[in-house]
Structure formats: structure tokens, C-alpha cells
Regions:
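Alpha-helical transmembrane segments of multi-pass membrane proteins predominantly involved
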Residues: 1-333
Length: 333
């Protein structure tokens, strides 16, 4: 059943960032999300943890869908249209019903922020990434996040950008909180999957920073960062799925996400360790990697967009996150 569910979810992901109608946006969100709730509960060796993570994802996902519907209703009441472009045009013309627009945009953005795992809507991310089967986790961490950020960019450029100065500090605060949570919570993790989960939260903050400071051509920069992050994430979780524990007799056991189980992999299996090293270097933004180019263009856009203080926060956090990436490298080698 995994292949049909994956195809349904992929279909929703393709429609989600392309939707120009709030009904289509919501239907695409549900088509994308409902298969994931089932897929998250399919782990065979840790069923209880998998069921718990799937239930948490489902309940919190229902709240995010509710916020998106409520925001769509407010924006429909304001513009008398369900088309996203029509709502943006109505805001550009100006009106006295600013409160409806602000509440509507805020609620829709909350629904999208949940899907990208931004703080304070990130509570599901570490548990779901840990409890779900690792291939499903990689799919969620990469494909879902790319689709959600694509939808957010479309909505922000069409609607929210007209209210940038009204909502800037709220969403800038969300970006800073997301970066800080992903950075400092990841420092204390001894489980590789949870560490990568908090890494994904920190990267969501960096991408949010780029969206808030969109410049001419900046959409391409954000999409490049998102694509580079997605490819590195798929690779990293693919490596996690290959690392297996062994018992005293040398028999191969299930996955071994515990950090202690990765000790010496660089000597016993240098290809796996070398692949993981490349992905971690990209996460850290080391020069000559796609992650470095993505961070460079996004941070440059933030400085040009008048939120240089956000870029400073991002640079400091990026240096701190490198610590737990290189801690894993030290354990492997």
C-alpha cells in the first residue's frame, strides 16, 4: 500500500504550490497529508512509537487545516473571491476592512508554517521523524517541505507581501524562534533522526528569512536553497536507513539511529560514512557545497531587504549547528 499512498501524496504536492484557488489549495493539502498520516504509522519494529507519532501528526495537522480554512473564509469575505490572485489585487486597491485581511493572512500562514515545521508549530516534527519509517521520514522531510515552501512563496508574493510591514515583525519573530529552536535543541540530541529533525527546523527558519526578504530574483534563490536542502535531506535519511545494529553474535538487527551505534562507521564502511559526510557538509553550508551557495544567496537577500539583523542571527546559528554536524562526523571517523 506504500506505493499508491506515495503517489497520492505526490499528486497533492504537485498541485499544492500551483493552486490559485483557496479550495484547490485546501484539497491539495489534504490529498498530500492524509496518505502521510497512514505512512507514518507503518513502522514494523516500533509499532507503538509509530502509531503515537502518526496520531500526533494527524491531530496537529487537523488544527493547521482548520486555521487555513478559517483564514480562507476571512479573505473570501474581504475580496468576494476564492482566487488567491484576486485577493492580492483587492488588497492592492486598498480598503477599510484591514482587520479581515490581517486575520485571514495570519491564519493561512499559520497553516503553512505548520507544514514546514516552523516554531512554535514544530512540536510534531521530532516525534514524527523519529517514529515513522526512515524512508517515509526522508520523504516527509524533503518533498513535503519543498511543496509547502512552494505554496508559501506563492501565497506570500501574491497576498502577504502587500502587508509586509504590518506582519513583518510577527513572521520575523517566527523565523528567529524557528532558527533558535532548531539550533539549540539539536545540540543535545543523541539520536541521529531527532538531530536531523531539529536540523530541518533550523533550515526552515533560514528559508523563512529568505521569503521575508524577497528581492527581485529572490524567489529563485529561495527555491534553490529549498531544492538543495531537499536533496541533502533525502540522502542523509537514506544513509540512516542503511546503518544497522548488530547483536553479540554479529547478526544484523534493525536501524540504529542512536549516535553511539555510529561509532567507527568511517573505518568499517567508508562509503556510507563518506556519503553522510557530504550531506552534513552541505547542511553546515561549507564552501563548494550546494548548502553554502543557498545560504549565501538567501543571507544576501536578507541584507538587501533591510533585515540584516536576521542574517546575523542566521550566520551565528549556522555556525552553531555546524557543531552537531561535526560531532556526528567525529563519531563516525
Amino acid at each position: 500500500e506504500m506505493f499508491p499512498l506515495t503517489l497520492f501524496s505526490l499528486g497533492g504536492m504537485m498541485i499544492f504550490p500551483a493552486a490559485d484557488n483557496f479550495v484547490t489549495l485546501f484539497v491539495a493539502l489534504e490529498v498530500m497529508s492524509l496518505p502521510l498520516y497512514i505512512m507514518a504509522a507503518t513502522a514494523r519494529h516500533r509499532r507503538q512509537l509509530s502509531y503515537e507519532s502518526a496520531l500526533k501528526y494527524f491531530v496537529l495537522g487537523a488544527f493547521s487545516s482548520g486555521f487555513m480554512l478559517m483564514g480562507s473564509a476571512f479573505l473570501f469575505g474581504f475580496a468576494n473571491s476564492l482566487r488567491i490572485s484576486a485577493v492580492g489585487a483587492a488588497i492592492a486597491r486598498g480598503t477599510n476592512m484591514d482587520w479581515m485581511v490581517l486575520i485571514g493572512v495570519f491564519c493561512v500562514m499559520v497553516g503553512l508554517l505548520f507544514k514546514v515545521g516552523a516554531a512554535p508549530f514544530h512540536a510534531w516534527t521530532p516525534d514524527v521523524y523519529t517514529g515513522a519509517p526512515t524512508p517515509v521520514t526522508g520523504f516527509m522531510a524533503a518533498a513535503v517541505k519543498v511543496a509547502a515552501f512552494g505554496a508559501m512563496i506563492r501565497f506570500y508574493t501574491a497576498v502577504a507581501a502587500y502587508l509586509q510591514w504590518d506582519l513583518l515583525y510577527i513572521f520575523a519573530g517566527v523565523a528567529v524562534l524557528t532558527i533558535l529552536v532548531g539550533t539549540f535543541a539539536g545540540l543535545v540530541q543523541d539520536n541521529v533522526k531527532r538531530m536531523l529533525a531539529y536540523s530541518s527546523i533550523a533550515h526552515a527558519g533560514f528559508i523563512l528569512m529568505g521569503i521575508l526578504a524577497l528581492q527581485k530574483g529572490g524567489t529563485g534563490h529561495v527555491l534553490f536553497y529549498t531544492l538543495g536542502y531537499g536533496l541533502a535531506t533525502v540522502g542523509a535519511f537514506g544513509v540512516v536507513a542503511l546503518v544497522r545494529g548488530r547483536d553479540a553474535e554479529g547478526n544484523v538487527l534493525g536501524e540504529a539511529p542512536s549516535l553511539s551505534k555510529w561509532a567507527g562507521i568511517g573505518r568499517t564502511n567508508p562509503w556510507i560514512a563518506g556519503s553522510m559526510l557530504v550531506f552534513l557538509l552541505s547542511f553546515a553550508g561549507i564552501p563548494l557545497t550546494g548548502g553554502f551557495i543557498g545560504k549565501f544567496v538567501v543571507f544576501s537577500d536578507a541584507i538587501k531587504g533591510g533585515v540584516g539583523w536576521l542574517a546575523i542571527v542566521g550566520l551565528v546559528a549556522s555556525a552553531i549547528t555546524a557543531f552537531y554536524y561535526f560531532r556526528l562526523v567525529r563519531v563516525m571517523f
